A protein has these predicted regions:
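Short S/T/G/P-rich N-terminal loop/turn motif that feeds into the first structured element of a domain
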Residues: 1-57, 65-69, 99
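C-terminal structural segments of small proteins and small subunits
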Residues: 64-88
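Conserved short hydrophobic interaction patches
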Residues: 25-29, 76, 89
Length: 99
């Protein structure tokens, strides 16, 4: 299954230092056990189209071999460290899980 998470950072957290810390956190969360593969990125500079949304600041893309492994990731301490450490930066978070 695929776990996609989109983050919108609050305006006051757009500075380079905060972004660097957040990116380090994204790197760490991609290393949590049970993840088959993980990566993150920023909106791609593709041509504007009515169907694309580039309003987010970061996207996190995690693959799991099963829903059970996804569920184990959700309660892993490193996941909690990420959420607790960065939740105050977020204006909005959108999760899309695909099977």
């Amino acid at each position: 299954m695929q776990h996609h998470v989109y983050f919108w950072l609050k305006e006051e957290h757009q500075d380079a230092e905060t972004r660097a810390a957040f990116e380090k956190g994204l790197d760490a969360v991609c290393q949590v056990p049970n993840i088959a593969s993980g990566n993150w990125g920023k909106p791609a500079p593709t041509p504007e189209r009515p169907v694309t949304d580039k309003s987010f600041d970061y996207g996190l893309y995690l693959s799991f071999d099963s829903i059970e492994k996804h569920d184990a990731y959700q309660v892993h301490p490193e996941h909690d460290v990420f959420v607790d450490g960065f939740k105050d930066l977020w204006e909005k978070v959108l999760v899309m899980d695909v099977e």
